[in-house]
């Protein structure tokens, strides 16, 4: 039993790594499925458009899904048209762009994975580049090749050119090599940029490593208990209403947060060293409905895993 609990605790502690690993495997599988089942290079002048659509359209869809499935996106935008101060609070107008940047970086993980896997495979890039009409690119690709290369490059992916099979294969391998080089460049650039942004965020943090670890734990526990409390109160309220409806009697008072309390608790959290509230709900409970003082020492240590609500 202790061994099972130890294994479970290990997987819970490594859930971010496991999640990204699962996302990577899912991306690889999806790309292979697209390549084998759906992708058929037309081997015509439409190669460029066809290849680029298959390369970038799934990445765009994954980016939109990343925004759509991120709870912080909805916390940021819900009610902003009615009350713009929600996203541009007085004294902290730049907070919106800071949080939006964090959401965007989080949403970019899946699209970058897709582009990396697709470029390493090389199928989409090979089709797209074989349809180029740019004289500069044609000169680069067809350098040292027969003159037919300039006119029949779009047929290379299908192997239907009038050139020798060895030349056709060389062109295909050359295009695939270019694609793989771009793929590794994208992976290295994304990894380095991720390291830089993480280091910058930690360097700018005004809380210690241990306090930040406690903050993450608190935020996760609060999220879990909040969901359970929602279910509990929703069950109690629905049970009371149904009972009163069928028994045709007036309901007893049911304690619920006020509209102002819901609004205050739904705001994005900003950390104040003087008060050390670890969530917006924590601040509302301690201070009532009074908003925290907007001092100049507000630090936006909004860790992605700590504030995904």
Curated annotation (Swiss-Prot):
Disulfide bond sites: 41-127, 43-158, 142-149
GO cellular component, one term: plasma membrane
Keywords, ordered alphabetically: Disulfide bond, Ion channel, Ion transport, Membrane, Transmembrane, Transmembrane helix, Transport
One GO MF term: monoatomic cation channel activity
BP-aspect Gene Ontology terms: ATP export
Principal place of residence: membrane
Transmembrane segments: 16-37, 46-70, 100-129, 175-200
Coiled coil ranges: none
Compartment(s): Membrane
Cytoplasmic-side positions: 1-15, 71-99, 201-309
Membrane topology: Multi-pass membrane protein
InterPro entries hit by this protein: CALHM (IPR029569)
Annotated positions binding a 1,2-diacyl-sn-glycero-3-phosphate: 15, 32, 37, 102, 121, 202
Keyword Cell membrane: no
Entry keyword annotation includes Nuclease: no
Extracellular side: 38-45, 130-174
Oligomeric form and interacting partners: Oligomerizes to form undecameric cone-shaped channels.
UniProt similarity note: Belongs to the CALHM family.
Protein name per its UniProtKB record: Calcium homeostasis modulator protein 5
Source organism: Homo sapiens
Lineage: Eukaryota, Metazoa, Chordata, Craniata, Vertebrata
